[in-house]
Structures are given as C-alpha cells and as structure tokens.
C-alpha cells in the first residue's frame, strides 16, 4: 500500500519528468528483483563448487529459485484472468505476495543495519576479546575463515588501551573434530603470534553462537566484575551475534573480519534465516 501511495502521489504532480521517473522505477524494481534471483542461483553453484555440498550452502540457490517462482506464479495467474475468473483465487495469491513483501523488506532492513553496525565506532577499552570458533581443517587445524577471525582479534588485542586485556578462545569439540575449536585457536595463537599464553583463556563447552557468548561471559565474570567484551567473528555474522549479546546482558561490541566475496550472499541469507527462527514470534505476530 505504501508503494501504491507513493506512485499515486508522484502521478498527482503535473511534472512530466516525475512521471517518467516513476515509470522507470516501477519497471526497474521487478527487473532488479528478477536479476537478483538469477544472481543467487549462479552464486549458489559457485559456492557449492568452492566450498562443497552442505545444507547451508544450498540457501543461496534455493532463495534464487524462490524469487523466480514468484514471477512464474504471477505469470501463470495473469493467464487465468478471464471473464469467468474466480476472484477467490486472489486470497492465497495475496497471502503469498504479502509473505514475499514482508520477508523481502525485513531482509533488506537486516542487511542495511548489519552494514551500519559494522561502521559504528568501537570503544577502545575492553576486558576480553572473544574469538568465535568455526569448523576445523582435518579436525584439528584452523581454516582460512577462522584464521581471519583470529588475526583480527590479535590486531584488536594490540590496539587495546587495557594492559590487562585477555583473549577468550571460544568453541567446543564437534563430533568430527579431534580437538576443540578453542584449543585449535589457542594452538594457532601460540605458534603464530606473540600473544602471551597467560593472556589466553579457553572456553571449550559451546556448540552454538549463543553459547559462545553466554559461556564466555560467565568465564570473564570469574576474573573481572562487569566486564566489557569485544566479540570477533565474520562481518556477516556480527549483527546476529550482537543481538544474542544483548539478550544475555553482555556489555560490549562486535568486530567483523573480511569474508570471501562469493560466500557473502549465502552467509547473509543464513544469518537472516537464523535470526527469523530466533525471532519467529515477531513475524507470526
């Protein structure tokens, strides 16, 4: 309705250029949405080729197919409109359109706020820097993705104005891993950086992002009263992580490290889906 109201407002003006601009926008928006669907499918195949098959890596092509199916549905619906057209068919169609619009606008808002959050200024004084774990290479070594997180955390460690700051390596041991993710992070720090061993704490119980934060918070509170945290993860993951941090009353900020460009679309979709599941009551309401 907002979209139609804006269109009506523009066409109420007597300026021909404004009319032409609105026509261009009306045509451009569906074209861009259609192209985004094609892009996500292509990106999905690139991701599957580089990262291998997994349920998470299927999100990008699935989202692309869903977008294209919307246009197919609208085309089929247009073909059914005749003189004896049953208008009750509009009810499920309008429901589907409404669902697409709600989730579409929410996804755009999610992405915009995620990027804004990354650019927000960070305070320099923290008591702990949390390195969020990730899957391990051959079950015992850090992956390039996890290495970028660690390097970003080390950079923040040396830039900190707190002489007593500590790193928390956070991550439990998966069923296919030989050691915990926290231990792998610790090994990398000891072997490849100058961070003192006594400045590294291990949190080896967590299996999810939420637990990473919760258990790290509990660990930090054993050493400092009302500690401030800087949690380091990938840029696409910062917004959801900061949402969980607020839920558990953690004081601190998120810091994102770079991500391979081909991985970003699928990663943001995955983060969005995870956030929707966590906040499903908001969408249902």
Which residue stretches match the model-derived regions?
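A structural signal for short, hydrophobic/glycine-enriched beta-strand patches
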Residues: 112, 118-268
